[in-house]
């Protein structure tokens, strides 16, 4: 009975894990660092308190601006009362028009002063708020860049700590420019393209994500294009600057017969494979290939699941020749698993 599995085509490339966002946390004000409220390496949320700068000078500045605002508000209230009296007296010509205009100008001037005072209060309040430094994004904090007690300033380029956003996290890898059309066509199908991250030795799958974007230009020097995939990474299997192998699924076929690419040959009559019968004798079968990559190919017609195909020594074969079957060794990597199969498999998985 045939298994209802899938023949899959993958594009592969080398890449590096990058944080979704990397932020150097800096102070916006100058002052003495009083406290750090994080542990190196911990996960933080946007808005979490990370550090405090001595707020004394900012509290004093705020009190001064608030006092000036209160004083000028009192002056404005008095000026408005005088203006009201002048307006009444002007009706009986007890004050001149010039005196009335001067009082009106004084009120307008004081109103402008009030607006300036309010801006000064807001600025002083902002300076005080900035003495409490919070996380701008979710992420993992790195090693602290400054110790408590040091004077810091808004001009410090090293900052206090660096936050890398790892939930989610991105993988940037490269593909040959010849693969661009394949990726674009797969994107137009409307379904997210699955991307797998494998370790440096290509022996262990670390995580699964989806294609995020293609770069907008090809690197003319290398003939490649950068591709970005995004991973949820809740298990922290991926880490910034980690080197990985990427495998992107771009096409699938249901109920597919899959054979190693090495078994597929090309002759005058078209594509063919050598098939072994129960007596280990070979016969040529014309086939119709489908999607393929460097390691395996889908066969749409010409052989069936369970047929045995020859992958080595093909140039020495003739019709009806009897061959010695050598069992394939166990495979460990995705590529080895694809090439080690001697049998045509229904929806063989890598």
UniProtKB/Swiss-Prot annotation:
Where does the UniProt annotation locate this protein? Cell inner membrane
Q: Which UniProt keywords apply?
A: Cell inner membrane, Cell membrane, Membrane, Transport
Q: What is its membrane topology?
A: Peripheral membrane protein
Mind telling me which Pfam families this protein's record contains? HlyD_D23 (PF16576)
GO CC term (a single one) = efflux pump complex
Asked if Coiled coil is a keyword of the record, the answer is no
Q: Does the keyword Manganese apply?
A: no
The Basic and acidic residues compositionally biased stretches are 334-350
Provide the assembly information.
Answer: Part of a tripartite efflux system composed of MdtA, MdtB and MdtC.
Please report which protein family the annotation says this sequence is part of: Belongs to the membrane fusion protein (MFP) (TC 8.A.1) family.
Protein known as: Putative multidrug resistance protein MdtA
User: What lineage does the source organism belong to?
Assistant: Bacteria, Pseudomonadati, Pseudomonadota, Gammaproteobacteria, Enterobacterales
